[in-house]
Amino acid sequence: MNSLPNLLCKMVEFLQKQSLILSKNSRDGRINSAFNEDEIFNLLHAHFRINSPNMRDWFDFSFEENETFYPVNIKITNLSTDNLNCKLGIYYALTGKLPHFDNEIRWANFFSTIKENLAENSQDYYFLIINKNDTKDIFATSLKCLNELTPNGNNLPFQANWAKNRILVHRNFSQVKAFILGTMGQSFALRARAYDEFVLNFPEFKVN
C-alpha cells in the first residue's frame, strides 16, 4: 500500500498555516504559475531539508526519507484539469528505478524501456497541489494513488483533474499497472481514432 511520506505531510501542514500571497506579475497564468512554483520552493527550502533540482530535472524538488528518494512536482492550479506529461515520473513509479533518459524520449523507446524494467516497487511520483484561488486549500497526492486519470489523445499520455483527486486511492501493483498503463492506452486509442477519421474523409492523404 502506498501512502504519503511524513515530510511531505508536514510541508502541507506548514503551507496551510502560512498566509500565502502568490505573485501575479504577468497576464499569462502559465508564467505566473511557474514563478509561483519558485516562490513555494524557496519557502519550503528555507524550512525543510529538500533538494534543489537541476535545470533539466523532472521534479520541482526532492527529498530523502528512510533511505527512499521522493520526487515532488508542485502544481499551482485552479483545481481544473492539468496535463501530466512526465514520462520520467511515470517510469519511476512503474519501475522503481531512476530514469536514464530525458522527457523527449520517443514513445516507442519509452514503452519498451518500461516493459523491460516494469517491476513491483514502493516508489511513486508525488504532487503538491496549491489552489491559486484559495491558498489555504493545499493537499498532496501521488501518481499511483490518484482517484482518476483522464485519457486525452491530444495531450499525451493523460491528464488529471485535481478537484477529483483529493482522496488517495490505495492499489496493489497489478491495479497500479492497469490504472496507469490502461489510461495511457486509452489516450493512444483516441489519438489513433482521430487519424482514422481523417483518413476516412481524406483517403488520398493516407500515410503509407
State what each model feature region is:
Residues 1-59, 65, 70, 76-208:
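Nucleic-acid endonuclease domains
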